[in-house]
Amino acid sequence: MKIISYNVNGIRAALRKGFIDWLKSANPDVICLQEIKAQVDQLDLSVFEKAGYCYNYWFSAQKKGYSGVAILSKTEPNKVVFGTGIESMDFEGRNIRADFEGVSIMSLYLPSGTNLARLKHKLEYMDLFQNYIDKLKKEIPNLVICGDYNICHEAIDIHDPVRNKNISGFLPEERSWMSNFLNNGFVDAFREFNSEPHNYSWWSYRANSRQNNKGWRLDYTLITKPLQEKLKRAVILSEAMHSLSLIHISEPTRRIT
């Protein structure tokens, strides 16, 4: 199973820039999208269906033009869950889950902490999400969480860890949360195959950051440990300002009910 995660920074803008042609070429079985910035009634879903993704599910923020996540799939999932059921988490449309045969795939867009109020919201969201996932793993042991976590976990994941140590996205409490999340039964898929520095998924538009590779690895695919032996490949596809994360896992066989 080939899974891609992609923060599109606006699906309507992405469509105008050739998203469908790219999607056909990349040809994932499932693609998780973040920051779609659109309501379903603003989209022509037939373009996704014609590209082979007849099963597409959208979870938009209540605020138009903001946040939102989606999952597009070639095959029909057994079940789709929109959000967590916790109102304080779901009004911004930040996670959606699709359960397939033997594996559940989630598209996640964690909040950013652009100011003190948003940082407080982000930290509260992270705690609630941790509790939600702890319970979910007991029900669904084979879980893939793809998305934009808005956190650089280790110094290796950011171009200048010293100067950015007090910036949201690399704060000690954010990094500690990520460590605890991983230690609670998850694996960073990319780091299973690549331990080298300078592998980033986001670059500022300022000061030629992309050209100089002054980036941040904010996007992760985390898998539960039962899936670790099934992981075949994990890479960052540096094709956009928010790079794409791709993993291959061997086809699971256990049915999720």
Protein language model features and the residues they cover:
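Metal-dependent phosphoesterases centered on the DNase I-like endonuclease/exonuclease/phosphatase
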Residues: 27-30, 47, 51-55, 127-214, ...
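Conserved beta strand-loop-helix elements of the APE1-like EEP
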Residues: 64-80, 197, 209-229
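Single conserved hydrophobic/aromatic residue that forms the stacking wall/gate
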Residues: 247-257
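N-terminal, active-site-proximal structural segment of metallo-dependent hydrolase catalytic domains
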Residues: 1-51, 55, 61-69, 153, ...
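Active-site-proximal beta-strand elements of phosphoester/diester hydrolases
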Residues: 1-9, 102-112, 146
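Structured beta-strand-rich core segments of catalytic domains in phosphoester-bond hydrolases
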Residues: 37-39, 45-113
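Surface-exposed cleft-lining segments at the edges of enzyme active sites
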Residues: 85-86, 110-126, 162-166
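Short catalytic/ligand-binding loop motif for oxyanion handling, primarily in non-cytosolic enzymes
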Residues: 40-42, 65-66, 114-116, 152-162, ...
